[in-house]
A protein has these predicted regions:
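Histidine/acidic-residue-rich catalytic or RNA/ligand-binding cores of hydrolases
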Residues: 133-134, 215-221
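Active-site-adjacent pocket scaffolds in enzyme catalytic domains
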Residues: 3-17, 82-198
Length: 222
């Protein structure tokens, strides 16, 4: 049950149950390749009535429920009893990124420490090295420049989508190509900037989607 919400609710809907097996396989492959497994939590509740209202106890509840989903997925998916097990438990998660990068940092850090987490990836910063705040490593998304604009955009594909296409996931082919080109140049410039200065890790958020003809994933792959 999400904090302050009815049991079984989500702010972004639910995937097709037939996708659960595919996602288990994808997580298994990611783990086998050495990728970090972190939490983005459960219902993705943003805005005035979402995670901004949550207390530390609410975040602890959300983390406990996330752990339960990871560790007891067979219980909630009886049709997958014969599916190969995940090669990890919820205890491998040592941090997370909150929905929409929202929430009270103090409440979040308190809950993270109780959960044994060591990092938070929910803030936005500059092209900088991670730093320790409140006993946790803060690993922020980074503000980077988009070609032809004076504003800096958080290094996440969704933020680029809002800036470049008003949040719409569809566009004409020529618009898609321009978005891909501009995004690639933004990513490349940010990489060049850190390589020629403080050599901080460059963090580029990507939902592995096909928004605007796959422009963001294509730019990242390039």
């Amino acid at each position: 049950r999400p904090p302050g919400k009815q049991r079984g609710t989500s702010d972004i809907g639910f995937a097709d149950p037939t996708m659960v097996g595919t996602r288990l396989d994808s997580l298994t492959r990611a783990w086998s390749l050495g990728m970090e497994i972190g939490s983005h939590f459960n219902g993705h509740f943003c805005g005035a009535s979402g995670v901004n209202t949550w207390t530390s106890a609410d975040w602890v509840s959300e983390i406990d429920q996330w752990n339960d989903f990871v560790d007891n997925w067979r219980l909630y998916n009886p049709d997958l009893q014969d599916h190969p097990p995940l090669p990890f438990s919820s205890q491998v998660a040592k941090g997370g990124r909150t929905p929409c990068l929202e929430g009270d940092p103090q409440a979040i850090r308190s809950a993270y420490r109780q959960a044994g987490y060591t990092y938070d990836a929910s803030q936005v910063g500059d092209l900088q090295w991670p730093r320790r705040i409140g006993g946790l490593w803060e690993i922020p998304l980074q503000r980077i420049k988009v070609p032809g604009q004076s504003t800096l955009i958080a290094s996440m594909d969704f933020n680029f989508l809002v800036n470049q296409n008003g949040g719409e996931t569809e566009a004409a082919p020529e618009v898609c190509q321009q978005i891909e080109t501009d995004t690639y140049e933004a990513y490349r410039s940010a990489l060049d900037a850190v390589m020629s200065s403080n050599r901080a890790p460059l963090i580029l958020g990507n939902h592995m989607n096909d928004w605007v003809c796959g422009a963001y994933t294509n730019a990242l792959t390039r």
